[in-house]
């Protein structure tokens, strides 16, 4: 029987490990991008699905607005309304966008897109430059909208009959 499994090298493992820890952004790559650069990248890669200025297109809904909507019951799901930490936006874009070419964008492009979308949501100024240090510092409106599950991890035998 042929041996198909090979031990993975540390260098190969690093290339696959693109996890980003929130809220501190541990794992964000080196790079940077501005709002102005993000607008150009958005227009070249995103506008067909997400519409002009991320207000919604023929394929997907808006990526702007909805801030505070989680408190009203009519939830509008946008990065500005739902993400508790800005590095989540970077992580999502890097892993899954553009839809037809996921993980095709360089870190600088993802930082620029993040800056642009955060600016459209009114969360950073038009002259903002996002990088591994500035992105985690963005205060997202829904930062306190999640509960931390601090229950202890326990293991117990499942009771199937005569349980108390």
Descriptions of predicted regions:
Residues 12, 34, 85, 89, ...:
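Stable alpha-helical elements in mature extracytoplasmic
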Residues 16, 63, 135:
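Short clusters of hydrophobic/aromatic residues that line enzyme substrate/ligand-binding pockets
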Residues 46, 89-90, 94-97, 111-121:
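Amphipathic alpha-helical interface segments used for dimerization/assembly
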Residues 38, 42-53, 113-117:
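The canonical Cys-X-X-Cys-His
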Residues 39, 55-94, 98, 132:
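Gly/Gly-Pro-rich "capping" loops immediately C-terminal to redox-active cysteine motifs
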Residues 4-41, 57, 98-102:
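Electrostatic cytochrome c docking/interface patches
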Residues 105-164:
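Flexible coil segments in periplasmic/lumen-exposed cytochrome c-class electron-transfer proteins
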């Amino acid at each position: 029987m042929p041996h198909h499994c090979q031990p993975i090298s540390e260098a190969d493992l690093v290339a696959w490990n693109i996890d980003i820890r929130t809220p501190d952004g541990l794992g964000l790559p080196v790079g940077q991008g501005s709002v102005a650069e993000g607008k150009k990248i958005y227009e070249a890669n995103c506008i067909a699905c997400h519409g002009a200025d991320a207000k919604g297109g023929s394929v997907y809904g808006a990526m702007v607005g909805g801030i505070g909507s989680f408190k009203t019951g009519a939830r509008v799901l946008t990065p500005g309304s739902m993400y508790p930490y800005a590095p989540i936006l970077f992580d999502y874009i890097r892993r899954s966008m553009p839809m037809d070419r996921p993980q095709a964008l360089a870190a600088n492009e993802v930082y620029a897109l993040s800056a642009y979308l955060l600016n459209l949501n009114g969360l950073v100024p038009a002259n903002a430059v996002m990088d591994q240090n500035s992105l985690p510092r963005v205060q997202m409106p829904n930062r306190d909208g999640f509960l931390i599950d601090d229950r202890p991890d326990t293991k117990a035998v499942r009771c199937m009959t005569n349980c108390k």
